[in-house]
Every structure is written in C-alpha cells, then in structure tokens.
Amino acid sequence: MGLCGLLERCWLHHDPDGVLTLNAENTNYAYQVPNFHKCEICLLSFPKESQFQRHMRDHERNDKPHRCDQCPQTFNVEFNLTLHKCTHSGEDPTCPVCNKKFSRVASLKAHIMLHEKEENLICSECGDEFTLQSQLAVHMEEHRQELAGTRQHACKACKKEFETSSELKEHMKTHYKIRVSSTRSYNRNIDRSGFTYSCPHCGKTFQKPSQLTRHIRIHTGERPFKCSECGKAFNQKGALQTHMIKHTGEKPHACAFCPAAFSQKGNLQSHVQRVHSEVKNGPTYNCTECSCVFKSLGSLNTHISKMHMGGPQNSTSSTETAHVLTATLFQTLPLQQTEAQATSASSQPSSQAVSDVIQQLLELSEPAPVESGQSPQPGQQLSITVGINQDILQQALENSGLSSIPAAAHPNDSCHAKTSAPHAQNPDVSSVSNEQTDPTDAEQEKEQESPEKLDKKEKKMIKKKSPFLPGSIREENGVRWHVCPYCAKEFRKPSDLVRHIRIHTHEKPFKCPQCFRAFAVKSTLTAHIKTHTGIKAFKCQYCMKSFSTSGSLKVHIRLHTGVRPFACPHCDKKFRTSGHRKTHIASHFKHTELRKMRHQRKPAKVRVGKTNIPVPDIPLQEPILITDLGLIQPIPKNQFFQSYFNNNFVNEADRPYKCFYCHRAYKKSCHLKQHIRSHTGEKPFKCSQCGRGFVSAGVLKAHIRTHTGLKSFKCLICNGAFTTGGSLRRHMGIHNDLRPYMCPYCQKTFKTSLNCKKHMKTHRYELAQQLQQHQQAASIDDSTVDQQSMQASTQMQVEIESDELPQTAEVVAANPEAMLDLEPQHVVGTEEAGLGQQLADQPLEADEDGFVAPQDPLRGHVDQFEEQSPAQQSFEPAGLPQGFTVTDTYHQQPQFPPVQQLQDSSTLESQALSTSFHQQSLLQAPSSDGMNVTTRLIQESSQEELDLQAQGSQFLEDNEDQSRRSYRCDYCNKGFKKSSHLKQHVRSHTGEKPYKCKLCGRGFVSSGVLKSHEKTHTGVKAFSCSVCNASFTTNGSLTRHMATHMSMKPYKCPFCEEGFRTTVHCKKHMKRHQTVPSAVSATGETEGGDICMEEEEEHSDRNASRKSRPEVITFTEEETAQLAKIRPQESATVSEKVLVQSAAEKDRISELRDKQAELQDEPKHANCCTYCPKSFKKPSDLVRHVRIHTGEKPYKCDECGKSFTVKSTLDCHVKTHTGQKLFSCHVCSNAFSTKGSLKVHMRLHTGAKPFKCPHCELRFRTSGRRKTHMQFHYKPDPKKARKPMTRSSSEGLQPVNLLNSSSTDPNVFIMNNSVLTGQFDQNLLQPGLVGQAILPASVSAGGDLTVSLTDGSLATLEGIQLQLAANLVGPNVQISGIDAASINNITLQIDPSILQQTLQQGNLLAQQLTGEPGLAPQNSSLQTSDSTVPASVVIQPISGLSLQPTVTSANLTIGPLSEQDSVLTTNSSGTQDLTQVMTSQGLVSPSGGPHEITLTINNSSLSQVLAQAAGPTATSSSGSPQEITLTISELNTTSGSLPSTTPMSPSAISTQNLVMSSSGVGGDASVTLTLADTQGMLSGGLDTVTLNITSQGQQFPALLTDPSLSGQGGAGSPQVILVSHTPQSASAACEEIAYQVAGVSGNLAPGNQPEKEGRAHQCLECDRAFSSAAVLMHHSKEVHGRERIHGCPVCRKAFKRATHLKEHMQTHQAGPSLSSQKPRVFKCDTCEKAFAKPSQLERHSRIHTGERPFHCTLCEKAFNQKSALQVHMKKHTGERPYKCAYCVMGFTQKSNMKLHMKRAHSYAGALQESAGHPEQDGEELSRTLHLEEVVQEAAGEWQALTHVF
C-alpha cells in the first residue's frame, strides 16, 4: 500500500486507533496535539511510539526525494515538482514553462503533462524502470553481487542455498504442492496519486504512457492487433498472442509433475493447484505414473485414460479452469491463517473507510419497503435511489466521501463468474448483509444457526472490501472472490462484479446518441452504433449478405451451417441464439407459473368512472367476419392487450420487453422498438426521393415501389395494375359481391373492414347511453358492484390492480378442499359467457367435474356461484339474432380459462375425494368401486349430466390430450400437439396470411389452403358427386355436398334426441333448450365463444373420418409420475407390469448413436463377427448376428411362406395366424397377440415416446415410426435425366437429335429367322471420325445407304453422332431375333475435334456421301477401293442383342482397300505401317452358326501373314476353328506423337481384348476372323481396335514353343494367340480408327525388347515379370492359384478380364464412369428396371422369382448369387485369406479388411494419397497394338479364355 493512499484515508476519515481527522480549516496541517508523536514530514500525530516508527519506515521506503509542501505528492524529478506547485496557486492558473493561462486548474493539470519528465528511475545496467529510489538501490545491489563473483541463491522456504537460479527454481518445485497459487498477486490498493498519466475520458491515472495508451483503447474501441488467420482484432498484444495459440495449437506451458500441457500459464497454475496440491481432508488417490493426486477414483481413472493410455497427449481442456474454480470454491483454509488474515485486515487504517462504502452500498441496494409479513416478490425490481444513469458503486463511493472511480467497465474483461451454493449453504453473503443492515437481526440469526454452520463460517474468511468493491470478499486458497450483494454469484475481477450488478440495478449507463436505447456494457453500445452508420463490413461467404457487426454475421452463418449451440436445459431443443433459447425457456415456466400463481395478487379492485363517459372512450368490438364455417369475431387489440397484461396473463419471463408508455409487452426488443415509435412519432426510415418517413424498413420498401412506377400486381379481370398487393386486394372487391364484414351492432355488411369500422363509430353514442345506465344500476346495489364491473371489464376502460391470489397451487394441492371455499369475487371474470366459450354456452352447472363423480361436492358451490352471477349486460342492441354465433375469444375470458380452472380443480378433487386414489388403484382393472381417475372420467356419466353429453367428447379430448397438447395459444388457451399447428392457429387471431396467391393476390394461413384455392383458378373440378354428378374443385366441398344425399344424421341433441347432419346445426338447435335470463339472451355474448367450438368440433369431425380408432384413455403427467414410482407386486398381471414400465420409460429417450462410436465404447468379447468389428458374449448371439450379413432367413412360416432370421420372431408371427390374443390391456381391455404389441400399445396411455429423431425434435412410440420418419430427412432430389456424355479430349458434349427415329419404312419387313443384311457405301464411314451426333440418312431404291452431311446440319454441332434409324434399312434388309422397338438407331460416334479438322482440311463432309457415281471423297488420307475386290463384314448378332450400341469415343471404320491402294502411315521411328482397312459390303450369315462377328480380310499380304502364323493345320477347314486373341492396352497419345496424316486429337483410350478364331484362308486368299465377344464390343466396351502390319516384314514371327506351357502337345488343332506389348516409342502409335494388325520382325532379339515389357506382364503377387500374358496367366494359376492377372496400376486391384479392369479404371478418373454411359437395353419384365448386360438382368430376375441356383454342398443352403455362396463357403473352411498389413487379423472379405484398416490403422488417408498420385512413367503411351509373339497351345486349354476376358 502506497503512502499517498494511507495519507488520503487518514485525511478523509476518522480512524479509531488514534489517527485524527483534519478539519476543513486545517489547510496548512499545522495543528498541535499534546502527548502525541508528530511526523515532521506529513504532520501526522500518533499516540504510540510503535505506530510512529512504523509510519516513518513507510516514509523511508515509499517516499520520493522531492515533496510538495502543500499536498502529500512526491516526485523523483525536481522539475516535475515545480510544475506541480503551479497547480496550487490561487491566482489564474498559468503554466510556468510556456506561460499559457487557463481558466480552470483541471485544464492546467492536463496541460503540464506535456512538460513533465519521466518519473521512473532507470537502471543504467539493464534498463529496468523503478518507481522509488529504494527499489533501484536493491536492484543495483544485485548487479554489484553479480560483478563481485558467485552468488548464493537462498530458498525462502527452507533456507537452502544454491549457486545458480535454475537450481533454485528446480528446488522450489518441491514447495509448489503446498505453496502454489492459481492467481497472480495483485496490489489491490495502488496509490495512483503519484501517477502522472491521466486518462482524458475518465480521469484514471497510470504510471507509464504505455499503460495509458492501452487504457484509452477501452474508451475508443480501437483494436489494432488483428489475427492474420481469422481477422479477429484485440486491443492488447498479449490478448492476440493468447488467441494465436488457438490456431497454432501450441501449448508451451507444460506441467512439471505430469504430462499435461497448457496454452496459458494461468491454466497451468490452476492445474497444479488442483491436482498437485496437498489434500488435507478426505481420502486421496495417487496416480502411479505421475504425481497427480485426486479426491475421487473416477477423476483418477479419467486422468489415466487421457494421459497414460498411449494415445495422443490430451491436455487439459479450456474448461479445466472452470473445474478448478468449482473445486476450490468451498475448500477451507487453516484456522490460524484465517485468524491472522482477519487480524491484519482489522489493523489496516482503511477498514473504517471500507465499512462506510459497504454501508452505503447496502443502503442503496435495499429493496423498497414492503408490507409487514410479506417477502418481496421474486420478480420485483429493486428500488435503487441512484440516478438512472449512475452506477451504484459510484454513488456509494461519493456518499462515503471517497474519491470516485470510473464506472465504465472494460468491455474485453472476461467474466469468470462462479455460482456458489444457495444462501442457506453460503452464510458469507447473508452474514455481511445482516451485520450492516440490522445488528439485532444478525444476532438472532446467529443464535438460531446450527453448530455446523458456525463451523463452516469459522473456516471461511470474510474480509471487508476495499473502497472500490461493493459487497464482501471471500478469499480462499489465495483466490479473492467478490460476492454480489444481490445474489450468490462471485467474480474474480471487480470490473466483472460492477458489470454484473447492473443486471440487478437495471442500470444502463451507455446511451446511444442517435436513438433512445441504452446499454449496460460499452462494447454492446459500440456494436449498436454501427447499425446507425449503415456500414456493413461483414459479408457472408455463402449468400454475400452483409452485416454491421461480426456477431450478427456469426448468428447468420448458423443458418447455413445448421449449428445450434444453445441447448434448452429442460428439453432437447437447440437454438441458434441465446435470445431464442431464453424465450423458449420462458415457455417452460409460463403455464406452471400461472397454475402455481407465483405472482400473488390482491383481489381485483375495479374503478368505474362516476360521470359521463366521453364517446371516444367507448371501446368498440371488431367487425364480424362472415366465413363458410360461420361467423368469427376477432379480438379487439386494445381490449386484448389491456386485459392480457392487467390480468397478468403474461409473465415477465415470456414477454420481458415492456412499453413504458402503455401496458404492452413483447418477446423481442425489436418489436418493442417499433411499437414505441407509435408513441413517439419517430419514423427513422426516410424515403430518399420524397422524404417521407416510415416506422419500419418493410413499409419503406413497399413505399419505394410507388416511385419506380412498376406495377407488378395485375387484376386478372380488368387488367388493372397496382403497385402493392394490398391495393390489388382492395381493388378486387369491386369485381365481387362478397361483403364478408358485418357490424356486430346492426348486422349491416361491408366489403372491407375499414368501411365497417367507420360505420361502427356511429354506434358509440348508443353504447355510451347503455354504459351510463349500467353504472347507475351498479351504484344502487353496492353488493354486486364487483361482479357487474367484472362482466363489463372488457367493454369499458377499467383499472385492475393485481397483487396476489388467495392461495398458491401448492396450498391447493395440499388441501384440495380449499378450492371449494373460493369466494366468487376471487375468481376474476368467471361469468357464464366465459364458460360458454369452451362448453358451447351450456349452463354453468355443466362443468367438468360432472365427469368425476355424481355426488360432487363442488356442484353445490358452483350452483351457489351461479345464483350470485347477475344477468349479463351488454352495450349491443338486441337486434343480433339468435342464429348468429359470434366468437369473442378473449375479452370475455377470466384470468385463468374456466375450463383450465375446472380441469385443475377436478383433478385435485378427484384425487382427494376418491377413496380409491392410491398407488395400487392405478394398477387395478376398472371396476365399479376402485378405478383410476382417468377411467372414471370416461365411464361415469349419468342421466343427471345429460346436458353435458353433447360436449363430452370435446371435453374428453381436452382432458386426455392435455399432456400431449403442450403447445397452448396465448389468445384463447387452445392446445395443440405440434408447434406448427399452433403457429397456423395463431394466424387466425393475428390475421396474418403469409401464403399469397400469385393470380389473385389473396392470402391464406397455410400452404394447403393455398393449393386448394389455386385449383379454383384452373377451372378444373376433379371431384364429382357419384349421386348427382355435380363437380367440385376441392375434396372438402364434395364432402360437404355429400352430406345432402345422406339420410344419416349422426349428431343427436341430448335433450330431444333429434338428429342433425352437422354439429353446427345441432348446436344451433341445442340453444333453444337452454333456459337463460332474457337479458343474457338479448345480448350477443351468449353466443360468444361459440365459433371456436364449432370450428374445433368440425375439425374433429373431419378428423373422425380419418381416424376410426376410439378415444384413447391417457394418463396425466402427475398420474404417470405416480405410476413410475410404483413397484408392482409379483401377483400383478402382465398388463399392470407393462404399464409401470411404460410410465417409467416416459422420460427416457432412445437416440440413435454413432455406429463407430458405439463400437468403440462396446467391450470386446471372444465371439467376433467375421464380417464387421462387432463381438458377442455368446456364440448363439454371433450366429444370429451373422445372418444379417449373409441374408439367411432359415425360419419359414408354413402359413404364408414368410421367412425370419430368428425363431422367436417366427413364433410371434405365427400367433397372428392363430388369432390368439393372450395379452390384454387392463386399462382399455384391448387384446394383443404378443407382449411387445402390448408394450407399444401401453405407450398410448402413458404418452411415452422414447424414440427420438436425431435430426429434429420429434419423438415416436416405436422405432419403426422413427425409421419411417427419418426417411423424409433423406428424401433424394428428383432424379434428373442423365444426358449422354462423350469422353474426348475436349469437354463432354451433349448429342443433338436431328433424326426422327420413330418413322418406319414400308419396305422394311421383319422375319423371325432372318439376318440383318444390306449394302453400305464404303465411303460412308471415314477413318478418324470419332464423336457424337445424329445425322439424317436414307436408303436409296437400290439399297444403298446415303448419309447427308451438309454444312447447315453441322454448323451448330459440337459433337456428331451418326445414327441409323429404322427407316434407313433397304428393301433387301431382313431382321431376325430383335425387337423392332429396339432398333431405332445404330450409333456411330465422331470426335468433334477431328470433325472440325476434317472440315477445315478437305471440306470432306460438305458434300453428300452416297454411292452414286461421280461423287468421290476429297480427303487425301482416304483411298477409293477397287470394286472388283470383294470384301465383306458378316455380323451375326446374338440372341436378344439390340443393335443400338453407343460406342463411346470410338467407331467401327470399314472400307475396302486393296494391297496396292493401302494407306501408308509413317511413325517417328521411321517404320512404315500399312493400314489395312476392311470393308462392310454385306451382312451374310451361315444358318445355324454361332453368334459372332466375322471379319473377312481380302488383303493378300494380311492373308499370307495369318496363314503362316496359323501353321499347316490352319488350312484345314475341317479342324477346330483357331482363335486369335488381340490384347489392346490402355495407352495415351498426344497430338505431337501422331502422324501428320492422322487428324486425331488426344483422347483417353481404354483397353479391350478380342478373342477371334481363324477358320483358314479362303479360296480368294482372304482370311476370316470371328469375334466371339460381340456383346463386349457392341455394348461400348471398345474404343479403337487397330491391326497393324509393318511394310518391312509382313509375316508373323514363328510360334513360340515354351516347354513350361501345358497343353501344347494335346490333341486338336493349335490356336494362334497374338499377344500385344507396349511399343518402345509412344510416338510410333497411330491412332487410326480401323482394325490393324502390327507385327514385329521375327529377328527381334530379347535384349532389344522394350523396357516396359516387363511391367505389362508382371505378376501382382510376387512382382515377377514374364514375357507374355499367357505365361503370366499360367504362372498365376500354378503358383498362386489365381486367375486375376489384370491389375490396376493405381490401387493394385486385380481382375479376370481386361474389360473389368477397364471399367474399374474409370473410377480413378474424373467424370462419369464408363458403365454409367452404357445403354441399358436389357429391361426387367417385372419392375421395368434396365441393365447394360444380360448377366446383370439374369441376376436381378432372381429377386423376383426367388430362384437360388447356387447350393452349398455342406449345409444345403442356397443363394441367388455365386459370390454369396463363395462368401458362405468360407464359414465352413474357416479361411481368412485377406490379412491386415498392420496387425495379425484376417478377414474373409477384402472389403472387411479395408474397413478394418481404415478404422484401426487410419488406412483411408494412405489409400487416398496413393489414389491421388498414381504412378506415371512420364512418357506418353500409345494404344497401337504391337503383336510381339505367337504362342501356340492346345485348343482345349484356351476354351475358357473367352470367359477370362
């Protein structure tokens, strides 16, 4: 504590220890006190020598050398003292440096700060700054010791000495367990009198300029330190550094005792104090791995699992600080320490000053005096005598005489609020407050306190606070907690307490200069001011919407992300903002507070005016709205709000924002703000064009449209245009004769409510006369004044003073008979009309309690109350007919709705009066004597209550569904089961109609009504009456019409048994039976409240047609809670036990857990599933579980054939066939066949819905309903038609259909056994044209095919697809085995880039391609054929094959070329390839031959090559056909590697293997190759198949004889296999669209083979390379037993066929997969599903037929797929071929192994990495097929070769 602070207190206060207080005249401090020790420096006197000596030592330690002789300030620099002395001059304040004069001393003080020199003393050695010379001297001594030599560092705790400071620090850690502190030691009482840097805003002084700079940022809001990662700004560099740790994840502060690490040093200190400090009381649990100590075993287990389980080091979370605070809150200090601290606190001279401040605070904070014997209300605001804009702390300081401190709180201070125990357990706060307010009360309380409380109080230390802190301070374990004087909250920082106190005082010192709003915290004001500037600097990255503050942006972003961080503590709902949650939480307490009557009130006092009432003050009703359902009268807004708030229907928690001009309250502050403008006349939203002001932005937007001249709302009748929808709606009244608004006084009708209201003002004089008559009658009889005024409360201006109700709900619950003694005046407004709202104008005796018991004690009291109720008066004339039923839904209601009152009373009375109401009665079956409350409400009705039967069903519905109808309307108290229903109902009160019709502008309350209305515009009347053929637009209109044809009259009058078709007619009739006073019947109020019932009953009638189930008996919340506590006896029935179980599970919620998290939490058992990571205790459980994976259902029902996985399910199912229902419900006597069905049914009675949707707040009775509901959350988007895509070097282009394929040619005829044949022009199809388009084509009379490729048809095309329609078939074409509907087109694709180049080079396609003479192609790369050379391609389609193949990125190019006319193409290596182009001049087929594609090649050179390759046996036509396998690798080409004559563009090429058989050389030297896999080619599996023959050596190499190959010497003709290999140079590839065969010279040495050859034939298992694919296949079979030799280079997956590999490779490429582009021509006859392959269709068909052709030989199980059988067989063999590469686990399926590796070893990341970086050689690859060798094997060995590929 500084000297100046001591002097300040000494001069301002009287200290009882002897320090005298100076009077005002003692200005020069020259006073004399005898026998006192006087200080010569400060002239203070002390009675004792010890005090004087201590005081002098303070001078020596804290004084600066230069002292002011007129005040206690001292200075280190003499110049600063000179400047200071000029402030004491009494004359004009003048600066001694610049001689500038000032009018005020304060201005001079601020000015001389510019001239002051640095006061701090700087160390010349290290530059450290010090305030006092003594501090500098101590510091310099350290430097001298360092220079002198070694220094001994002594431990202050144990006096040990160490040579280095690091050793001392290590040693001090041993004392940390005892002397650790979680907070820094601050000097709470800083002497700021000597600080020279003053804040210009608040006057606070600081020692350093840097401190002042940081402080000023609090006032200016400047945040210069911005985060580079997220843009967040801070006002201090240290805060930014702390924030950056969140991004970096750095935790530099490591605990020395355990592995924990922290980002902040304070968290580390708190951690050390919490887990490493000594625990004095109670058991402790020590960690075996580190030195952590815990008080509970659970904390130790949590610590071990986090820190010592080998996982990542989980440092203590950010919430650990909060746990530290909670843990240390009630830890006690040693008694000696407490006493010592208390003694030191009392010895301080400032204790009296502190007590004065606390006294002032408590006086200011005392609530207003309340009546004796009553405690202040919980919600009552504290009456504070401070000004509205002043801080209570500031006022207390001023009253106590201390210097004031700034009240502005630091906006950036974090509030470490800490809620302590309640006052009963925390005597600290109460003791302080009692001591200060009333000592006598405090003594009495101390006498009554128990010894335990006294012990607790002794263990805790209470210190009085400093002058700056209100309330008390509780210090615990070195932490000072500042207790709020109003509540039990505690804070570490005084500034946090100051801000918190404003919550209680409602002080908002920070006012907005531009509007009326004020705020408690300056940061909130700063954010608010940004809304006035119009600057919206924060933009949403999703929708680009801008916001003025970052907080608003954060809340908005939650709309996009769906984050709802604020959860309700009472239910499962979550909210985006805390304000929404706060509003929602109030709804939980709203009804309970109303029921419990927490806000007690006195009986209502009604003050009625004595003199004439002015006409404008007469309240008018709202116009009656005429609808199809009846007459509806809306609530008058002024009467509703007045009654609503005066009668306390709304609690403060629900509508916290109240208008201080009127009684209205709102849920949101923005609504209040807009409402207040109606009082103040403020219109802040100005139109920039005309200057008009508006109260809201929405009205301004609508107004701006009037300036634009845009009239977007048009009348459909007269074409008139209007600016707004309201103008159009008003205009539409001209075109119709509807007059829906009726005056409630004279029944005159109007088109608009505005005109009706104008008319209704003419009735005010009549109403005023009636009111005067009513007042005169009221003054005659004083005994009935209260009751009459209650009836007129909604028709006149009254003032209701509410204080308290006679009894609370708790008292009523304890003594239900008290409800019977209520006087009528206590039940505010329970007139007959109010009951009529809910009970359809029944007499008051028709109350709910008639359902309880015939001998109800309440009936007499109700009858007595009815006799006391006078005849109702009304301001309306008697002209309103009886037939009108007017809804007056609110202003006639009592304080509590009458039905609600009677429901509460009936429940309480029935519980109290029924002798059978006990725990066991709820379980007993219903009987005449003992039955539960719910059953009695249903079953007991007698002839005495016949008048209630009409409303019984409605009454039951309200009673039974009360627990489920939790959403209540604030206007009429009607209950709903869903919030959406309530929302729609509220619109009937507010008049909101958000759903607008686009055609006529009418608004509707729901989208369903709008949809029905829109049908009226279409004129379509789809609903016809089957009796009279009348048509209606909606189903509801038809339903109402059908009632006219029905002779049934289901609605019976309970008085005369007359029947009616509708409830409306029945209720109108029932009114005739009612005996009510004439005055009551004369008013329109008797019918008031009827429409709500009519609407509700009609709605229930409509729902009755949908639900045929009878009414369900439902237990109330109290009954269910009582049932849950019951333990049923052993003799109880199954139904009774199930009822108790269902009641107990009502609050249980079964949520869907994350599967992976659930598997991790579950314990591991010995019986593990081989398909998934689950494990089970019993082998039988595992067997049942495995059936989920295998799909096995061994238990089959003999009755219906249904199969089940478990036998118990079959047993339950069989009971449904027998009809036995052994389980009966004792509540409603319904019977069920299984116990599970009974359990589900019992939830209807208890209302239990344990199954909660994880995506919303809905709950369901069964998991199946939840599952069905969850499907709505995953509803897929409507499937879009997939557009055909083409992979090419450019983008995928959409085809344009230019051909009408639906037309047919009369010359086409279809025969069953014929083959498609025809003549095609060889020049029609050009080499190198690959793409996609549909071109028109036709067939001439001679059978020639003509395709017209004109410039006009190609001008707008990017991709061209050649499509041959059905009408293109010539007269000699025959079709067999093909559906005529499937031959609409034959697709050949042309690459768009090639087409473009072709058009540019030779204008090839500009002419008509036809077979007419005189037309020849002009392309130099294409040669005309010799017509004398026969050439043909014979195509025989397989059975059921559709000739509609879409060959993706390829085409089949055919053309006749002789040997002399061959096209020469030159590659980069200098070799010339002879392109052999084969022709397609006819489609012929031998009858009965296999379905295959035969290529007859007439080129002599190719024939010779094939003949030599085939060997001598090949010429024999009688031998077996030889097969040639053409393997085309997937290679890439670039434009640079293509020959100059080839117009090809780069494209991705796929792989295809063709198995062809050679039947020998024909007589014309031609060789025929037959392609067996026609389906693979025609379904789009081919890209480009090239057969090249080099010009150098036109011979195939000799047959390779490998002794290792099996089957070579076998019988049968040898077969020729042409094996491909990768070319040495990628540029040698010529991507021609033709069948080419490339041979390699037979003299090719093995050393000259390409280096990539090994990779092309490399074993996937052992990485061994082979020279050919055949050798590799043989090796894979013999060594590894596998046939999958085609491996993916990316993911190493293996396939049997190259086509499968090709399809798989598409998964590694971007864009649609190849399989998705294949045409799905094979359709299922049952479900119309289509497939690309017949095998897929065959497998699919087994689903419908139930065929299971694959049988297990060991257990006779059958499966519909071979793969399922293979998986099943592994169960018998126990084989687990797929081993995990990281652990020893094995799996039967590779997918399970991958799943295991992803979960257990995080293999997914590595897999993605490898997939994202496939190995590339860096060279461009070619797809040209180089046939390297011919391998001869026996034909039998290669029979399965076609299946492999």
Swiss-Prot record:
Q: Which GO terms describe its biological process?
A: cellular response to glucose stimulus; regulation of transcription by RNA polymerase II
Q: List where Basic and acidic residues composition bias occurs.
A: 443-458
This protein's species is Homo sapiens
**Where does this protein have compositionally biased stretches of type Polar residues?**
427-437, 1286-1297
Q: What does this protein do?
A: May be involved in transcriptional regulation.
Does this UniProt record's set of keywords contain Membrane?
Answer: no
Put simply, this protein is called: Zinc finger protein 236
Q: Where are the zinc fingers (C2H2-type)?
A: 37-59, 66-88, 93-115, 121-143, 153-175, 197-219, 225-247, 253-276, 285-308, 482-504, 510-532, 538-560, 566-588, 657-679, 685-707, 713-735, 741-763, 967-989, 995-1017, 1023-1045, 1051-1073, 1167-1189, 1195-1217, 1223-1245, 1251-1273, 1657-1680, 1686-1708, 1722-1744, 1750-1772, 1778-1801
